[in-house]
Amino acid sequence: MAKPLTERFFIPKELKVFGRWSVEDVTVNDPSLRPYIALEPRILPHSHGRHAKKPFGKAQVHIVERLINKVMRSGASHYKAGGHFMRREHRSIMSKKMKAYEVVKEAFMIIERRTKQNPIQVLIRAIENSAPREDTTTIAFGGIRYHMAVDVSPLRRLDVALKNIALGASIKCYRNKTTYAQALAEEIIAAANRDPKSFAYSKKEEIERIAQSSR
């Protein structure tokens, strides 16, 4: 007779992200973002791209994994960010998920040490404060182009916030001794506190200010 699973395998009582941080007490205050921030308990935030071909499938990807995926981005290539073209500057983690995984884990440890809070909760606050509610789009009428203010969908708000958090970390550690993990931790903490030093928070304010002037 086969032994039960609890005797054959080690099954933890509570699944924690990176084996350290629980998501049970993590709250999302923004009602529009709440359905799109996946916080199901898991040890390893890696979905193996199962949702890649499903419409809106990325809404089911764990929020920490989505941050890891943004950390792997190559940086701005066709425009300057922070006054620099940063493409290939972070080649050591471009498309290398395990390295990005370790970077985010180290950043979370720094956040926990500095804030004495659950770093996942701090990340959620940073996302809520960095997600623009309004943006502008270009429309053509009578051969003339106009800028018009539009509402931003919740999924795009989440995408923009994560992208700017990762990009802000890249700017902070551009050609200096600050490691990417340290820069990422500083960016997340600053965005969570609505600090103007945060690139993501400042970018959100800029986007909404331009949209307001285009009404």
Curated annotation (Swiss-Prot):
<dbReference type="Pfam" id="PF00177">
    <property type="entry name" value="Ribosomal_S7"/>
</dbReference>
<dbReference type="InterPro" id="IPR036823">
    <property type="entry name" value="Ribosomal_uS7_dom_sf"/>
</dbReference>
<comment type="subunit">
    <text>Part of the 30S ribosomal subunit.</text>
</comment>
<comment type="similarity">
    <text>Belongs to the universal ribosomal protein uS7 family.</text>
</comment>
<keyword id="KW-0687">Ribonucleoprotein</keyword>
<protein>
    <recommendedName>
        <fullName>Small ribosomal subunit protein uS7</fullName>
    </recommendedName>
</protein>
<dbReference type="GO" id="GO:0019843">
    <property type="term" value="F:rRNA binding"/>
</dbReference>
<keyword id="KW-0694">RNA-binding</keyword>
<keyword id="KW-0699">rRNA-binding</keyword>
<dbReference type="GO" id="GO:0015935">
    <property type="term" value="C:small ribosomal subunit"/>
</dbReference>
<dbReference type="GO" id="GO:0006412">
    <property type="term" value="P:translation"/>
</dbReference>
<dbReference type="GO" id="GO:0003735">
    <property type="term" value="F:structural constituent of ribosome"/>
</dbReference>
<dbReference type="InterPro" id="IPR023798">
    <property type="entry name" value="Ribosomal_uS7_dom"/>
</dbReference>
<comment type="function">
    <text>One of the primary rRNA binding proteins, it binds directly to 16S rRNA where it nucleates assembly of the head domain of the 30S subunit. Is located at the subunit interface close to the decoding center.</text>
</comment>
<dbReference type="InterPro" id="IPR005716">
    <property type="entry name" value="Ribosomal_uS7_euk/arc"/>
</dbReference>
<dbReference type="InterPro" id="IPR000235">
    <property type="entry name" value="Ribosomal_uS7"/>
</dbReference>
<keyword id="KW-0689">Ribosomal protein</keyword>
<dbReference type="InterPro" id="IPR026018">
    <property type="entry name" value="Ribosomal_uS7_arc"/>
</dbReference>
